[in-house]
């Protein structure tokens, strides 16, 4: 029992800074929306449309680079720290190549925006302008993620948290300058949010690099000599590990976007209630998602040390802590769902629907916690392909079709509206949790030599 308590302390020491960093990141998006809304409703809508395109694109790159964390954690655990700097350099090359692709996609996203039915031309122009300003921050964001993954792979999560809050504090005044045109800058409205956020990502990256250069604990890593050129073999391995994670993230984001589109014809009340419940459940998701990142580090580190039993302990501890957290957040959601809904809107119909949907959200929080932590465990084992297959099957083969049938057809019951989609979420997330656990058990029952050989690739 003592080993689980000790492991839980180590996990939480890693997870809490990651949680706070994620809160800072979320707060930046909130600040952009509020400050753009203070300028005009059109600018706020433009930022919302632009963000809905930016997120899937940048999260794809983010997911690709998540491969670095278990690689660095295992090298650190095995005492092969001299190889870490080379992996990080290749991570920067990969981030640079992916940034170019993302920037090209975002530059041409105007075709998607203007294709939207009945969109106001002025709104479309502002959304395109916002994206074309924001896209210059894509390299800064992804370079920051490489540096952050280096620190977190070495079990140092606090730098990412500090840089997140630095970014938030810088974002507010820079937003103000570019939205309203102060200190000789042009008045750009919502487009100014894109300029500010792009600049902030570069500030965060440069601040993180400055920290890494000065950190005594990483002196041996930054002094490591080696080629700075792209090395196809290393980059290929990072892509093989990271691409399934990137695709899984992309599938998850697009799933919720598709459901939002399917709900939109049902009316204002249904759309508002769905959005409130989704926004709140996304906030709750920060907890297990951050814990999953910590579990990846701990499992990878233990495998690097050559201890499959300690890796199992880290995995089981992460699951136990995650289930405890999810139980508490579910109780909180059920107990205060109406009061939470009232914070968003005071329309009685909207509040009633949102409260009902949050009840369904509480049901799946434990499954959601298990599946996302399970994904983190599999990343630690470098078993990332299974994450993609499980995500695709659970969300797109089971969850979305069942939600569609329940929400919009009478094949099983009378059309349930948004609640049908949320039952689909429950089906999808529960299926994902079961499959993640089965895959984890399959891996852990392999002979230790095979587990370590797979993990060291």
From Swiss-Prot:
The chain crosses the membrane at residues 11-31, 53-73, 93-113, 127-147, 160-180, 189-209, 243-263, 276-296, 314-334, 350-370, 387-407, 418-438. InterPro entries: MATE_fam (IPR002528), MATE_MdtK (IPR050222), MdtK-like (IPR048279), Multidrug-R_MdtK (IPR022913). Pfam families: MatE (PF01554). The keyword Secreted does not apply. Keywords: Antiport, Cell inner membrane, Cell membrane, Ion transport, Membrane, Sodium, Sodium transport, Transmembrane, Transmembrane helix, Transport. Residues 1-10, 74-92, 148-159, 210-242, 297-313, 371-386, 439-457 are cytoplasmic. One of its GO terms (biological process) is xenobiotic transmembrane transport. Belongs to the multi antimicrobial extrusion (MATE) (TC 2.A.66.1) family. MdtK subfamily. This is Multidrug resistance protein MdtK. The lineage of its organism: Bacteria, Pseudomonadati, Pseudomonadota, Gammaproteobacteria, Enterobacterales.
